[in-house]
Amino acid sequence: MKVYDCCELVRELYAQIGSGDQGYIPQAISCAVRALNEIAADTALPLAAREKAAFAAANLLISDFED
C-alpha cells in the first residue's frame, strides 16, 4: 500500500513526520501493533472495527518483520 492510497488523516501525518513537524518512531511495527491492540480492546468501538484491528495486529505479530 502506498501513502496516496491511505485516508487524508494518514497522509497528513505522513507529511508532518516527513517534514519533521511530528515525531518519527523508529520501531514502527511495535507502534502499529500497540495502536491496533488498543483499538481491538476498546469495547466502545463497533465489533467490526475491533475485529479488523485485531486481524491486522495478529498478522503483524506473525509476520517476519521485526523492529
Swiss-Prot record:
Protein name: UPF0253 protein VC_0872
Taxonomic path: Bacteria, Pseudomonadati, Pseudomonadota, Gammaproteobacteria, Vibrionales
InterPro entries recorded: UPF0253 (IPR009624)
Coiled coil residues, start to end: none
Family per similarity comment: Belongs to the UPF0253 family.
Organism: Vibrio cholerae serotype O1 (strain ATCC 39315 / El Tor Inaba N16961)
